[in-house]
Design a protein with these regions (language model features):
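Regulatory/sensor and coupling segments of signal-transduction and defense proteins
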Residues: 1-192
Length: 192
């Protein structure tokens, strides 16, 4: 590369500008980067909640989402199954989990640890984290015209509890929620 080369990046900007910059979409909403501050914002019991969410049956949606099952002719049945539609679908999912999620969480005392692809990892004041999960579920349902659902595992912890251990316990709850008939559920505090 030449010494004069400059790389320019923008974050979460959907409008193109004249400058040749690379736009990065990042789900990075954070009410605070301090877990104790998040716990201070909880109502009633002073606890944080960890929430892990994952879109249900997304792999199946990619495989069969564009197939026309009512068509008997194989060519007509697979007419809309192509790489371009799958790529557009993937972009729309990324847009939801890396861009729209930031505005959905505004005003809540939660912070995104990870959001992208089809899953979310949040930490926050326990009551705000529950609200965040409900907002995400409601808006994803609307965003996909009711075609996709999401399951969640949510657990409460003392703010000094190790995040890694909390994440593993919450992942187990998320797995339990995925076992529900029809999915689209939540496993809370060791209860499905």
């Amino acid at each position: 590369l030449c010494a004069d080369a400059v790389r320019s990046y923008t974050k979460n900007r959907l409008v193109r500008t004249l400058s040749p910059s690379v736009n990065l979409l990042v789900g990075d909403y954070a009410a605070s980067n301090n877990i104790e501050d998040l716990a201070d914002q909880s109502e009633g019991i002073r606890r944080i909640a960890i929430c892990r969410m994952d879109v249900d049956n997304l792999g199946q949606a990619f495989i069969a989402g564009f197939e026309q099952p009512d068509q008997t002719d194989p060519v007509q049945r697979m007419k809309y199954v192509n790489l371009f539609r799958a790529a557009a679908f993937s972009r729309q999912m990324s847009l939801f989990f890396k861009y729209h999620i930031n505005s959905l969480l505004q005003g809540l005392c939660v912070s995104i640890v990870y959001a992208g692809g089809d899953d979310v990892f949040l930490v926050g004041a326990w009551n705000h984290t529950l609200q965040a999960a409900l907002r995400i579920q409601k808006h994803l349902r609307s965003y996909t015209c009711g075609a996709l659902t999401i399951s969640a595992g949510i657990a409460l912890f003392n703010e000094h509890y190790p995040i890694r251990a909390a994440a593993e316990q919450t992942a187990a709850l998320e797995d339990e929620a995925k076992k529900l008939p029809g999915k689209n559920g939540a496993a809370l505090f060791d209860a499905v």
